[in-house]
Regions:
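Acidic-basic catalytic patches of nuclease active cores, encompassing PD-(D/E)XK
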Residues: 1-40, 47-49, 100-102
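Short, well-structured alpha-helical interface segments that form or flank functional binding sites
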Residues: 16, 39, 63-67, 137
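Short, solvent-exposed polar/charged micro-motifs at secondary-structure junctions
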Residues: 42-46, 116-119
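Catalytic cores of nucleic-acid endonucleases
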Residues: 59-111
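Non-catalytic C-terminal interaction segments of nucleic acid-processing enzymes
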Residues: 3, 98-185
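Conserved catalytic cores of phosphodiester-cleaving nucleases, focusing on short active-site segments
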Residues: 21, 44-61, 80
Length: 185
């Protein structure tokens, strides 16, 4: 007689993916914040010196996580996505190779550890012109305030980007603005 079928390993939750990515980045020497804006706009923000990386996590819906990483590129020097399995990660790489999403790092979680299928690459090559330089500088100031305690961890701040056309002169592409955190008197 055979016993019950072996249980299939359960798929990790998004919280598990974020935790694994946070631990992975901390081991690499980054200071890491999970949901630093209190609005769940940024899943993870990692900083080492002046370098800022952003990580978006999704258990399913790979297209959405890639779109999120592309939208958030204005604030980080690099972005990565972390998904629940190697097959999903491989699908993301196959769909994004040769596209503007190719610099996005693609990671998956295996038994609680992050595996990198494609490492994250900088959005702007060394010496290249950075169309988001001002936004990245402002975002670093927000991270400085978080690191120093001037902006308490877990405090809600308006870091969610808004599509505006001011700098583009209305030429049809959206640019992003980072709202400064506000202090209560």
């Amino acid at each position: 007689m055979s016993g019950p079928a072996p249980r299939r390993a359960s798929r990790p939750s998004e919280r598990d993916l974020v935790r694994a990515a946070r631990d992975h980045l901390a081991r690499l020497g980054y200071t890491v914040w999970a949901d630093p804006d209190g609005h769940d706009y940024f899943d993870l923000v990692a900083r080492k010196g002046e370098e800022v990386g952003l990580v978006e996590a999704k258990v399913a819906d790979a297209r959405t996580v890639v779109a999120q990483a592309l939208r958030r590129r204005a604030w980080g020097d690099w972005t990565a996505v972390v998904v629940a399995g190697r097959r999903g990660a491989a699908g993301i790489v196959a769909r994004t190779d040769g596209t503007r999403a190719a610099p996005i790092g693609v990671w998956w979680v295996d038994a609680g550890s992050v595996r990198e299928l494609r490492p994250a690459r900088p959005w702007v090559p060394p010496g290249g012109e950075d169309p988001f330089a001002e936004l990245r500088t402002r975002f670093r100031r927000v991270l400085d305030a978080l690191a120093s305690g001037d902006l308490p961890g877990g405090a809600s701040w308006d870091g969610v980007g808004r599509a505006i056309r001011a700098a583009s002169g209305g030429r049809g592409f959206a640019e992003w603005r980072l709202d400064e955190p506000t202090r209560e008197p």
